[in-house]
Curated annotation (Swiss-Prot):
One of its GO terms (molecular function) is structural constituent of ribosome. NCBIfam families: rpmD_bact. It comes from the Bacteria. Belongs to the universal ribosomal protein uL30 family. Part of the 50S ribosomal subunit. InterPro entries: Ribo_uL30_ferredoxin-like_sf, Ribosomal_uL30_bac-type, Ribosomal_uL30_ferredoxin-like. GO terms for biological process: translation. Disulfide bonds: none annotated. Pfam families: Ribosomal_L30 (PF00327). It comes from Methylobacillus flagellatus (strain ATCC 51484 / DSM 6875 / VKM B-1610 / KT). Signal peptide: none annotated. The lineage of its organism: Bacteria, Pseudomonadati, Pseudomonadota, Betaproteobacteria, Nitrosomonadales. This is Large ribosomal subunit protein uL30. The gene is rpmD.
Length: 65
């Protein structure tokens, strides 16, 4: 099996809905992904931990590969 390229191991995540009124764990997941403001986009490593945070708050995010 060939090693994957580092550029392919990034996921683009954009916060499209506010965290106001959300449960504390979901706000923590958004912060853990490095998102602070609406429409802010970050690139995170494709790891199981980041995938779990993205799945938990997927209703707040737009995700691109």
């Amino acid at each position: 099996m060939a090693k994957s390229n580092k550029a392919n191991d990034l996921i683009k995540v954009t916060l499209v809905r506010s965290t106001i009124g959300r449960i504390k764990a979901h706000r923590a997941s958004v912060a853990g992904l490095g998102l602070r403001r609406l429409n802010q986009t970050v690139e995170v490593q494709d790891t199981p931990a980041n995938r779990g945070m993205i799945n938990a708050v997927s209703y707040l995010l737009k995700v691109e590969a």
